[in-house]
Amino acid sequence: MARCATRTGWRASAGMLRFSSTCQGTWPNAPAFLSVPSSTTILIPKRSLFVLPFGLDVGLLGIGAYYCTRLKKPDPVNVMSIFGPELGSKEAEANPDQVVQCIAHRGAGLDAPENTLEAFKYCVERECNFVELDVRTLKDGQLVVLHDQGLQRLSESSITDVTALNWEDIKDIDVGVTHPNRQRYKEVKLCLLDEALTYLLEKRVRCIIDVKGDNKEVVNGIVKTFETRPALYKSAAVTCFNPATLYKIRKMDPKIVGAISYRPYCFSAQDFDAEHGPTNPRFGDNLPVHVVLRFLDLLHSLLWRWTARWCGVSAVLLHKDTVSLCEVRYWRTLGVRLAGWSVNRPVEKLYWRCVLRAPYLANTLAGEREKEKEVQVDTQSARANESAVKTEKQEKELA
């Protein structure tokens, strides 16, 4: 602290202030107050030599907090048990039956009513041992397997918010009346998460649990489900679009294998594809809100990879139109699995199998076994051609 004595008078001495090193913060012609006694001192703080530029200290603090609070990944053995060996790896060549190529999105929702026991049974019949399902909480705290917040799309019901209802209120609603195969699937009901997991574990079907909502009940419900069913640690992964929700779940139980889901414009638009871009805006009639959501989309696109690593994820589930070979290599270097959704066209499935060499989530299982045979034949023929070329080179060298 610098110490400077104030003189009585109308103006301070300019000469003293000009050559004094202890009063650098005082103006040369600053007026002095008559009422101030001559013995009064004014304390002037000096600027520290270690003060960081504006914003740099906040940035360093944020980086430190990021690395201090980042969660660790779960046991790699559990990750391997769920997702199997990576395509193209030595483990995959040694154990081709354990390679995951197709994951039934919502239990193959185009072939059977989505997120129902009938859909999961259909997957078992089609020899698909990996499904994805969605989970929400009800008013009574139970976890129901359901994607939408309402039931208008799946049934003729006018219910718009199931979180305000109990299980007894919706358990008898037919959710297959609007499905394309409704003639085959009649009187299809919703199911609770416990019912679905009981069946899937019995049939040794692995699953990805997509958590919908960010309330405390769903977080506690997922953690409790894993605690009561230890087999899930090696057969189920938890995913979410909201990294904060996934962080809460994995912080409460770090043994849970986590995955982050991502697609562009998830804040401002309900749908997205590469051909049409973002469609069906959430607040299209409110321009200020729409602009704010677009800004959040921009921040999300810049930060979602950091938030994924912050949550200690073992896999990322990306919209198929955002995935490239560079994206696949990036996550493989980090030891993180990548899967795309939703890949339904036969040509797209072959592209994912043969070029990207990564698993995908599909709404239909039509032709999956045939594609696997085609890929196996192509792989065998490619290896045969390579061996033939090597043999020819060796013969030429010997000759």
Predicted regions and their residues:
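Phosphate-group recognition and catalysis centered on beta-loop-alpha active-site segments
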Residues: A2-T8, A12-R18, T22-A399
